Amino acid sequence: MKQSNNQVGEKVLVLGAGQLGASVLASLVPAVTQRNGSVCIIVSGRSRDKQSKRRSSIHQQLADAGARFIPVDIADSSVAALKDQFHGFDTIINCMGFVAGAGTQIKITRAVLEAGVKRYFPWQFGVNYDVVGKGSGQPVWDEQYDVGTLLREQNVTEWVIVSTGLFTSFLFEPAFGVVNLAQKTINALGGWEMQVTVTSPADIGRLTTEIYLHQPRITNEVVFVAGETTSYAKLAETVERVTQQTFTRGVLTQPDLQEQLRLHPHDPMLRYRVAFARGDGMWWPMSDTWNAQHHLPTQDIAAWLKTHQ
């Protein structure tokens, strides 16, 4: 791992200010500005209304804190156009997610490299794509693997991948099919012994800023963080203990999920369930996480649930 010192006065660009981007920016903007740096944020041109007012109060708060917004439609932009937008920034943190469509993450990464950006945090805030590899049943994950390969094949731009597991809230998304608080059901993906790592967006934002600032500087490394790593059996116990309710339990086995996927190959949530039922790459021990090793507290599932039930 190459090490170098953080410089004051850095120009940082964040791509996206949605759920994760806003969480990252809440910690990042004050940290960078205190060091005489600047933060710019690329968002869609649709982020303003017809009167040129910001549609999001969060965007307005970030602007008031000193961040500058740049309207760019990344999905419709070429690599060359993005290269021009990215040129001159010291660090780019990609919080765009998958909403911009297939191929976008590779396009962004190529533009970052062609622009000669010093340091890049790609959109890899998820599972361990190196372990998952290709053919997981989730096509966008194949692209994530390719992004990692592209970064490792070059030596101009430093990169940092922050692996977070699932957003904690996603476990409780009814469409995902794991915990449904309204219907009081819990399904294990693959089996009750299977494990999953989760982190809240607020913790991801705070930890990403800490990793960005850390000395010696972290470069060319996958950094694992987590709010909690749990088995589905322990998850069921946690949910019932916190809610003081009894939940109906079920298991979605890998063969059953594969058969459902054969019948409904374009169902995105079903593809997620198939991928997580594999187990490999979906979790890591808390003792291996950067936050645990640096004694930084994070929100576990019980704490998250107490504030969201």
Positions of predicted regions on the chain:
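NAD(P)H-binding glycine-rich loop region in Rossmannoid oxidoreductase-like domains
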Residues: 50-115, 129-132
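Conserved residues at the C-terminal ends of beta-strands
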Residues: 95, 123, 165
